């Protein structure tokens, strides 16, 4: 392991001991917010520090075994040879584990997220596909124990959605779902196609982390245009007699958010404001990370329509992820919410990218 990485670990050990002392300080205990933050930091550091101590212990075992290899007794030398072999394996494994623990973590990964699905090229068929995607994500969320709440939807007459915004509540939701951002393409024969021709349609998916109220971007009321209107449910299931739906327009950026799935204007406005703040925060983050993205390719797409990440081919029963050249012939399972076959390889690829960057970094 690089000396610079070992030095980084030694700094973390010092910080771990410092936090440990602070947690026993009466002044810290009396400040609940500070105590909560330090407790969280301590738990994160403890995993790394304990792993580093195991690594140091394994290094010592290896050094002792190497000393034994110079012994005059041939039996001792043979035993040392076996111990060196095992100790090297242990050291390599622990070094690899430590490097993974040191990978930079996205502070948003543990947060809830907003899911936006928009039908693109393909007309009614694209809207139907948007409905398929939302059903897929809903089933996946259910399997993870997450809760999905539709915040705004624009249903298509032929089925599916022209546009849909939902919130996904659950631990680690954004950390996994963020890899779904980008262009999704479907190739299949529409039910209305009499000639049996395969059509290609597309949808855009955008996943944004929910921004906690304390960290939310401050929006000047003068920069906000608020419109209210009457809302109707999917397929016209209900029509409110009051103007409960809310449309917010952020004038400086032209960002527009609508929410109408709650019966109360107050709730719709609160939800719309939360989505707007998340969109503005994401735009700010993308801008600040632009330079980094040119240096290291990112598997998390920006949600640009032209950035196609996945194709769902019905005739062949396959799903292809174009970011990592992965194809799985499990279309039905994927559409039923089994996304593990797609998520696990891309998470590993993202981890490999970060490890490569770590190995080149100087601390």
From Swiss-Prot:
Q: Where in the cell is it found?
A: Cytoplasm
Q: Which residues carry this modification: N5-methylglutamine?
A: 237
Q: Cite the entry's keywords alphabetically.
A: Cytoplasm, Methylation, Protein biosynthesis
One GO cellular component this record assigns the protein to is: cytoplasm
Q: Which SMART domains match?
A: PCRF (SM00937)
Q: How is it modified after translation?
A: Methylated by PrmC. Methylation increases the termination efficiency of RF1.
UniProt GO molecular function: translation release factor activity, codon specific
Record bears the keyword S-adenosyl-L-methionine: no
Q: Which residues form a coiled coil?
A: none
Q: Where is this region: Disordered?
A: 281-302
UniProt cross-references to InterPro entries, sorted A to Z:
PCRF (IPR005139), Pep_chain_release_fac_I (IPR000352), Pep_chain_release_fac_I_sf (IPR045853), Prokaryotic/Mito_RF (IPR050057), RF-1 (IPR004373)
**Compositionally biased intervals (Basic and acidic residues):** 282-295
Q: Which Pfam families match?
A: PCRF, RF-1
Which protein family is it in? Belongs to the prokaryotic/mitochondrial release factor family.
Function of the molecule: Peptide chain release factor 1 directs the termination of translation in response to the peptide chain termination codons UAG and UAA.
Task: Quote the protein name from its UniProt record.
Answer: Peptide chain release factor 1
**Taxonomic placement:** Bacteria, Pseudomonadati, Pseudomonadota, Gammaproteobacteria, Alteromonadales
Q: Which gene is transcribed and translated to give this protein?
A: prfA
């Amino acid at each position: 392991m690089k000396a610079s990485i070992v030095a980084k670990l030694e700094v973390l050990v010092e910080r771990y001991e410092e936090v440990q002392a602070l947690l026993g300080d009466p002044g810290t205990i009396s400040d609940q917010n500070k105590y909560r933050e330090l407790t969280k930091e301590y738990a994160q550091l403890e995993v790394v520090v304990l792993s580093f101590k195991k690594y140091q212990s394994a290094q010592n075992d290896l050094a002792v075994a190497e000393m034994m290899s110079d012994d005059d007794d041939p039996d001792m030398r043979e035993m040392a040879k076996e111990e060196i072999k095992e100790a090297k394996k242990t050291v390599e494994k622990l070094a690899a584990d430590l490097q993974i623990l040191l990978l930079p973590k996205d502070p948003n990964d543990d947060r809830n997220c907003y899911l936006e699905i928009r039908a693109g090229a393909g007309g009614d068929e694209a809207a139907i596909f948007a409905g398929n995607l939302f059903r897929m994500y809903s089933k996946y969320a259910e399997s993870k124990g997450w809760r999905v709440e539709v915040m705004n939807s624009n249903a298509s007459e032929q089925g599916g959605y022209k546009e849909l915004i939902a919130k996904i509540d659950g631990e680690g939701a954004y950390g996994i779902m963020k890899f779904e951002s980008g262009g999704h393409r479907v190739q299949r024969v529409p039910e209305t196609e009499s000639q049996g021709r395969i059509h290609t349609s597309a949808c855009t998916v955008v996943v944004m982390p929910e921004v906690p109220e304390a960290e939310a971007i401050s929006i000047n009321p003068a920069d906000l245009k608020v419109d209210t209107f009457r809302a109707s449910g999917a397929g016209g299931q209900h029509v409110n007699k009051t103007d409960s739906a809310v449309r917010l327009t952020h004038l400086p950026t032209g960002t527009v958010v609508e929410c109408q799935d709650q019966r109360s204007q107050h709730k719709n406005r609160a939800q719309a404001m939360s989505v707007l703040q998340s969109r503005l925060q994401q735009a700010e983050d993308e801008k600040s990370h632009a330079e980094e993205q040119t240096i290291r390719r990112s598997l998390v797409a920006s949600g640009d329509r032209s950035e196609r990440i996945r194709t769902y081919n019905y005739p062949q029963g396959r799903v292809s992820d174009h970011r990592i050249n992965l194809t799985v012939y499990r279309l039905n399972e994927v559409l039923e919410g089994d996304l593990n076959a797609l998520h696990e390889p891309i998470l590993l690829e993202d981890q490999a990218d970060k490890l490569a960057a770590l190995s080149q970094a100087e601390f």
